Amino acid sequence: VNWVLFLLPAAALVVAAWTGGMETLSTATLAAAEGAVPLALGLVGVMALFLGLMKVAEKGGLLDATARVLSPLLLRLFPEVPPDHPAMGAMVMNVAANLLGLGNAATPFGIRAMEHLESLNPVKGTATNAQVLFLAINTASVTILPTSVIALRSGLGSANPAAVVAPTLIATLVSTGVAILSARLLQGGRSVPVAVGTSAPLWGLAATGLGLAGLIAALVAWGQTIGHWIIPSLVVALLGFGLWRRVAIYEAFVEGAREGFAVAVRIIPYLVAILVAVGMVRASGALALVLEPLGRVTQLVGVPAEAVMMAAMRSLSGSGSFGLLAEQMKNAAIGPDSFSGVLLGTIYGSSETTFYVIAVYFGAVGIRRIRHALACGLIADAAGLVAAVIACRVLIA
């Protein structure tokens, strides 16, 4: 990450000097640094809400119960983590939130999972294999319901706003599989034997799989309607579960929510570093300088130039990629229902802002040496792009 942090601004400086855009670069650098603080503080309310709800679920035993049901799978993915460790339940909550397209909820759950994983870290400041794998799964971002894309398509008058659901699911399943495989191959060293501990029978995992398949079918069929119900239902369900388990839900909620501000402040230095580097590359024109000729090459194998631009922008900037998506869909030559419109929505919905996720998740626990996490994230992003193109070719074209 040290080399990445140097090379991005250095490339931006060279390109800006060549094109005469130094004034723009200077302004963008300061704007990116200033923007990190409101971005972090903007997370405070959402973090407080979902960390509070998570504390209620934790005290009620929901996280432990969920981890036990999924233990046959979790123990193979994360053999370094003890079977009954609270990190297991926190990771499940994070993946579930991503699955439903609840990015705002997934971040607090993911940070809590990272904190639990850090408690097992023998070398503080260096990411463990479990932390790298968990982050890689997050950058792949398995998603059933890409809510923001569906909302944008609906607002632009799409005849079928939920058309992106099926290709997005396929692309995220592929990118997640590649993320897991790349993390395993790049971690080095010997494999850790699967721990033995309290585990649910395999029928519990099978029942969960069937339930997930039913949920996928429901979201594909009625995703646009169901999407508005998810967050209110989640709040009521978790608080209701706490009452049923005789948890003092107000005290538990406040205890968890109190951590929201501290976490947001803790990630500011990491956000500044990433956002400044990314902002300089975008403002200098270095990104376009690389991607425009690359797009002409990828078009020869069926990958549109705008898809390459979207994939690269998505890895670097959430707001930038969403702005690009909206701009392209408003273009009369593309529109939301064309092949390119659906493809761009699928790429956005099936990937994550890799650099931002690394900054937030690792920054929250003070990880400075990220090992192979960035490589895994970018490999997963590339796999997701290829899968999105193929899925849209088969299902849409």
Question: Which sequence ranges carry the predicted segments?
Answer:
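Hydrophobic transmembrane alpha-helices of multi-pass small-molecule transporters
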Residues: 1-27, 31-40, 185-264, 397
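Hydrophobic core segments of alpha-helical transmembrane domains in multi-pass membrane transport
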Residues: 5-18, 47-55, 139-143, 147-151, ...
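Transmembrane helix-loop junctions in multi-pass membrane proteins
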Residues: 17-27, 58-62, 144-160, 215-226, ...
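Membrane-embedded alpha-helical segments and adjacent helix-loop junctions characteristic
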Residues: 23-119, 246-331
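Short hydrophobic alpha-helical membrane-embedded segments
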Residues: 85-90, 203-211, 350-351
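Membrane-core helix-loop-helix motifs of multi-pass transport proteins
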Residues: 117-206, 335-397
